[in-house]
């Protein structure tokens, strides 16, 4: 009888191991991940919350930025003083037509903070992840001339020329897909704009940046302030 039990022991151990392994390999939930929105308020007024005019942006940009560059070749020679801006875990960079993807380090750090805070805020508010999209960064003098030929209202004296200013779209966002392929419910651009406005309002109130709400351009025009140190 005891010998019979001993013969069955390896089989028992094998079955127990298989049960444990199966339990540990629980199938991933592949159902549509829905949004569960909560505490989304936005700001009372975009114009009143983000009123900083170009002169204010320009004054700070001149203090903390680089000297204006004539062309993109000159910008290449300044790489050691600038941070390359490219798609990362916090934000996406648009196809830049009238600017090049460089910022001074403290402005780059602010951009990381905006992207990180936005993702954290979406999670806290029960919304699926999306990244902000950067639509304009450093402009050379040639970039400004080309832009003014296309848009007569564009400023000849742009804060973008100093590498401390960037634009973040409020019209478009980049959806972050689930790494395992689980489908995610979309979040409307209007809702994402509300959340982004809260994030930017808080940073402006903390004196991290100047912000101007651009209606026609569909973006927030942002300049890093002196007291914002790189993280």
Model-derived regions: residue spans:
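Second-shell loop/turn segments in exported
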Residues: 93-105, 132-134, 178-189
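Short, surface-exposed glycine/acidic/tryptophan-bearing loops
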Residues: 142-167
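Acidic helix-start/capping segments at beta-turn-to-alpha-helix junctions
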Residues: 127-144
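Extracellular/periplasmic catalytic domains that process cell-envelope and extracellular macromolecules
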Residues: 126-128, 158-164, 213-216
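Active-site acidic/histidine clusters and adjacent loop/turn architecture
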Residues: 80-128
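Bacterial Sec-dependent N-terminal signal peptides
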Residues: 1-33
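Conserved small/polar residues in nucleotide/adenosyl-binding loops
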Residues: 227-231
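Structured segments of extracytoplasmic/periplasmic soluble domains
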Residues: 110-125, 150-153, 171, 199-206
């Amino acid at each position: 009888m005891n010998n019979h039990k001993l013969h069955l022991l390896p089989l028992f151990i094998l079955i127990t191991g298989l049960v444990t392994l199966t339990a540990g390999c629980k199938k991933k939930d592949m159902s549509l991940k829905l949004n569960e929105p909560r505490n989304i308020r936005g700001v009372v007024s975009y114009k009143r919350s983000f009123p900083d005019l170009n002169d204010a942006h320009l004054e700070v940009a001149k203090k903390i930025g680089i000297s204006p560059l004539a062309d993109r070749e000159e910008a290449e020679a300044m790489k050691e003083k600038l941070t390359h801006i490219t798609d990362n875990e916090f934000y996406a960079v648009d196809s830049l037509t009238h600017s090049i993807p460089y910022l001074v380090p403290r402005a780059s750090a602010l951009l990381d903070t905006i992207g990180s805070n936005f993702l954290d805020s979406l999670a806290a508010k029960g919304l699926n992840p999306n990244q902000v999209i950067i639509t304009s960064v450093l402009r050379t003098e040639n970039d400004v001339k080309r832009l003014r030929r296309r848009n007569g209202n564009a400023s000849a004296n742009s804060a973008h020329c100093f590498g401390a200013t960037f634009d973040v779209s409020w019209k478009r966002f980049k959806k972050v897909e689930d790494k395992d392929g689980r489908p995610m419910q979309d979040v409307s651009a209007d809702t994402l704009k509300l959340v982004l406005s809260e994030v930017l309002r808080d940073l402006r109130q903390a004196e991290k940046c100047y912000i101007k709400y651009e209606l026609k351009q569909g973006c927030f025009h942002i300049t890093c302030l002196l007291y914002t140190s790189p993280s």
